[in-house]
A protein has these predicted regions:
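Membrane-lumen/periplasm interface segments of specific transmembrane helices
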Residues: 1-63
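Signature aromatic-anchored transmembrane alpha helix within multi-pass, membrane-resident enzymes
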Residues: 1-2, 124-148
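Hydrophobic, aromatic-rich transmembrane alpha-helices
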Residues: 48-77, 90-94, 117-118
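Hydrophobic/aromatic-rich transmembrane helices and adjacent perimembrane loops
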Residues: 42-51, 102-124
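Membrane-interfacial loop-to-transmembrane alpha-helix junctions, especially the N-terminal start
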Residues: 71-86, 124-132
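A C-terminal functional module that forms or caps the active site or interfaces directly
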Residues: 75, 85-95, 101, 112
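Membrane-interface catalytic loops of GT-C/OST-like multi-pass glycosylation enzymes that act
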Residues: 95-111, 146-149
């Protein structure tokens, strides 16, 4: 919220830019595909760039929401849950806004480190296999998927 307010104070009126940006996004290739394609495609692209360890971490995060609300978790774990969980909510809001159609593997890169915090929630015995899965996934995507980056 602080960065948004800072930009507003500096003169950037996002509420004026949003409708124009929305219109520009829906020109071109985005107009060819239905919104549901982008809704699920964006999340799939994010899943590919984050890798399986993050998926596991987010799964653990989802199971710890109730203990978080009851303050039954240690402070470090609570901080990880809050940061990674907040970023997952930001991703959901960004996806629901329909403002990103394709290229989320580039546009959503700032979300990835925050989501990656969720890997700290994995049980210790899962961390080495999760790291191996991340490396294999990264190499497979880099070598088998054609991207323009």
């Amino acid at each position: 919220l602080v960065p948004v307010l800072g930009f507003a104070v500096a003169g950037f009126a996002w509420w004026e830019a949003y409708p124009v940006l929305h219109e520009r996004y829906w020109d071109g290739i985005a107009s060819i595909r239905p919104a549901s394609y982008w809704l699920w495609g964006n999340l799939a692209a994010l899943a590919v760039i984050t890798g399986p360890a993050v998926w596991g971490g987010l799964g653990v995060l989802a199971t710890r929401v109730r203990p978080l609300t009851q303050r039954a978790l240690p402070e470090p774990e609570r901080v990880v849950l809050l940061l990674a969980g907040a970023m997952m909510l930001v991703v959901i809001a960004a996806d629901a806004s329909r403002m990103s159609k394709s290229e989320v593997e580039r546009i959503w890169v700032p979300f990835v480190p925050w989501l990656t915090l969720s890997v700290a929630l994995l049980p210790p015995r899962w961390r080495s296999p999760a790291l191996l899965a991340q490396v294999v996934t990264a190499l497979a995507v880099q070598h088998l998927a054609y991207t323009t980056w």
